[in-house]
């Protein structure tokens, strides 16, 4: 079951964040040398904000292994962040970001669990009607996951990121949380 990280989890998240950026640099706009997600003080402040959350799955305990000490927390193996837009013009939207599952734990439902937890939080925010996210062209499994949760593609940003001279497109996706759009339509299929 996903947990919502608190300020005290900032060091654990920063460790996983560094692995994320090194494992899949094409999937994230940040790099280890300029990422605020590696700054513990920044993370502690962000995690204390009600309009910001990171959901995570912890490494399950191994059968037959002694339990961890009271102050020793398990490593994080999957995460998804969500933030409610603060601008009055975009207050009806939230954005999911930083979705990652450790390679050894992929394909086991951990990604789905943390993204679903983020969507559930967005549903609890009064006035939020849409959840947005982006997925790199190299992230086929992630795009399939998002589509299975109801996200639809609405645009493709050519050459959104560049790493070591290679450029990657990004697919922009949205999820309408409830009911039809204001014009009576319902985004139920990709527009690209």
Task: Briefly describe each language-model feature range.
Residues 108, 112-113, 137-156:
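Conserved active-site alpha-helix within GNAT-family acetyltransferase domains
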Residues 128-129, 152:
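Short acidic/polar active-site loop segments enriched in Thr and Asp
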Residues 131-143, 160-164:
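Conserved beta-strand-loop-alpha-helix junction that forms the acyl-donor binding cleft
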Residues 7-104, 115-117, 121-125, 176-180, ...:
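Acetyl-CoA-dependent GNAT
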